[in-house]
A protein has these predicted regions:
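Short beta-strand segments at enzyme active-site cores
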Residues: 53-56, 95-99, 155-168
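Short acidic/His/Gly/Ser-rich catalytic and metal-binding motifs that mark active-site loops
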Residues: 62-64, 106-108, 168
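A generic, residue-level signal for flexible/boundary positions that often mark functional hotspots
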Residues: 2-9, 124-127, 168
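N-terminal capping/small domains of soluble enzymes
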Residues: 1-100, 141, 149
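Non-globular sequence segments
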Residues: 86, 100-157
């Protein structure tokens, strides 16, 4: 049995060990982009010796936002994200990002529209009605996931995790 603290090959990426800081919402974004606080947090995790640290809960499009301090993965925030990934890499760790569309859990104020999700119902965070997506909206969100993966690559991330649980 291999040791937890030995290198591990994850696809094309070699992690220095098998420990991963999983994606858990940091609530450290500003204007849906990264902050110095978010960078310092992940750099400190990397400095602590983790094999990979994962930024959490980045929406793939505006309609997928749930919280004010959440990331919205789009080209204009790539420089800030690149600052994080470069700094994490300098500490010897890999950098991942979790992407998703919050669906039934989006907020009217952050998403800028009535929440849309897989089905009609209510947002459990804000008790706001949710409209079920039309086929064209489903297709657009699927395209947004693809764009987000490319944006993550441009920002220097080594991996992408898709968040698709509990109402998303």
């Amino acid at each position: 049995m291999s040791s937890l603290f030995t290198p591990y090959k994850l696809g094309p990426v070699t992690l220095r060990n098998r420990t991963v800081r999983s994606a858990a919402f940091e609530s450290m974004g500003r204007h849906f982009g990264p902050t110095e606080q978010l960078k310092e947090y992940h750099v400190s995790v990397a400095r602590g010796g983790v094999g990979m640290t994962t930024l959490a809960y980045a929406a793939v499009c505006r309609s997928g936002l749930s919280f004010d301090k959440q990331l919205w993965l789009r080209p204009e925030i790539v420089p800030g994200l690149r600052g994080i990934t470069d700094a994490v890499h300098r500490e010897g760790a890999a950098a991942g990002i979790q992407i998703g569309h919050c669906g039934n859990m989006t907020h009217l104020t952050t998403a800028g529209q009535i929440p849309i999700g897989a089905s009609t119902g209510f947002n459990l965070y804000a008790y706001t009605p949710v409209r079920g997506m039309r086929k064209d909206e489903i297709a657009q969100v699927a395209r947004d996931f693809g764009k987000a993966v490319h944006t993550a690559h441009d920002a220097g991330f080594d991996s992408v995790e898709v968040h698709a649980g509990h109402g998303y």
